[in-house]
Amino acid sequence: TDEYVQVLAPLLRGERVSFAGDELRVTAGPVQLADGVPVPVLVAALGPRLLRVAGQHAAGTITWMANAKAVADHVAPRIRAAAEAAGRPDPRIVVGLPVAVHDDVAEARSVAAQQFATYGMLPNYQRILATGGVDGPADAAIVGDEASVSGQVEALFEAGATDVWA
């Protein structure tokens, strides 16, 4: 992933690339960009290694199942430190979580538990859920009435998210 991002990101910025790594050897570009607009590369990253790669070489990261605590304590500090060490601008942190605007929080969490149970069985998601201090995907989901959901989304931005998708 590291080498791939080191090649792909500059190509999608319209730059020429000459790269020789352990796995890839590439001389290419510059590529023709639609309307000359660079394409940002965002790496799906939850763990320390890929957050480092994203910070060093990409425009940012896209997460899934990382709640505000996980973003503040784990995702944002790691990716920002990597970007800073590489002399790069602050990265985008795109946070994705299930969202349900519903008056019955227990019912909404019950549905979320069924719909997103698979994530609770996968090691990478188990780690990010634990980092966020929750037992499973249903507990990470943003649920409640409009005011509650709005506050929970705002907490993601306060934790370091630059974008939120739901």
Task: Locate predicted features.
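Active-site-adjacent structural elements that line small-molecule/cofactor binding pockets in enzymes
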Residues: 1-166
